[in-house]
């Protein structure tokens, strides 16, 4: 909407959807990322807020405080000061009575505003619970003060937003208003999140206290015969790792793909950094190696990790170089993620292991040095300071000279909070995913050994061997070493 006044600021009312950050619309995401200030409701999910802070660490996020008039005034004042204000609300803005009042208040001013619809809680949560609403249903928010008795004569099923504390009272009121006590209802908390919990029962059972008193907060109560179809349509909660708490001992930057894959299987990933990546203590060795690339010293460069690729890119930027420095140099990688990082650099790797994505797997495919076919007999191997000698020794056995260069250091991270340490040792995690020997050593060092009930998944043979050395039982190992393959193997294990 536009008005005949000139403002550099504006207000965008954005629907956040039911909770899952992936349900933000493309337009909503763009508006939030480009905003100067975000005013958000308390019931906007932590997942959505976290997605924002990761995308825009400098974004100002403030809770919306006060009644609709006060919240509208806060937004209008900021917009008149030239700021773009995103008013972030759970679900869809026009299905929230209080937010509608805010928008009406904003509309009475000269400040330009837009409304970006969100996925409505009243339709999304039943869908995530496996309850089909069909073409006709009745939705109401009991927190707005609507009479339960007035809803009984409305088209079924009923979809009621409420607080968990009043589930029993609501069921009792529905029966007293005329619905049979045998009518089925599904109560869902944390709808669309990996922590979603649903319980099906009759109104009589809920009236008698079937809903757990520990499950507080916002819930969606779906009432009617359609609830009976949940046993066949519960797609979200039937995923193989649904509800599993999985420990991911990696930095947040490295854990992104793994955590996303875990969520796709229904797990709740908990990222606990065990290592920090730092530059080498003396950069001279790395400087000489990079200059050697430019002068034609190397026939091959071998990358064994994303961190190694990142270290070389940073050194290139420091020295004013780009991908052209790789001219005439063949590139080998261990792991698809490492290869993808190289491709992002503008280079296509010549060699990846055809089998096991490990140093041993690469050695099986790496060609021996041939003084006729290979004009240069030297390989550059940029890697961590604590890497094993397996790859270097194997390349030398194949006739290559190897410059084994420390590209980065891995140092042990600070211990996690006490609650996390206790959960690790006490069985508070269903599984742990180890992606390197250093993550095993460092996790045990800073937090202790995982409980014997915890499923231990290791990315490859060397990592598994280290875990065994520390007295851990290795339950899962993918056929092909890789972060995503590791998660897939864990999901298969859960189904076995």
Q: What residue spans do the PLM features occupy?
A:
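A short acidic, amphipathic alpha-helical/loop segment
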Residues: 27-28, 51, 74, 102, ...
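Conserved beta-alpha
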Residues: 45-46, 68, 115-126, 139-153, ...
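Charge-patterned, long linear interaction tracts outside catalytic cores
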Residues: 159-160, 164-175, 181-183
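Active-site/ligand-binding-proximal alpha/beta "capping" segment
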Residues: 93-109, 148-154, 167-170, 418-426
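Short Gly/Thr/Asp-enriched flexible loops that form oxyanion-binding sites at enzyme active sites
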Residues: 94-113, 127-130, 313-317, 444-447
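Class I S-adenosyl-L-methionine
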Residues: 1-116, 212, 219, 296-308, ...
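Short glycine/serine/threonine-rich phosphate/pyrophosphate-binding segments
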Residues: 21-24, 94-100, 119-125, 166-170, ...
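Structural motif
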Residues: 10-12, 36-37, 59-62, 83-87, ...
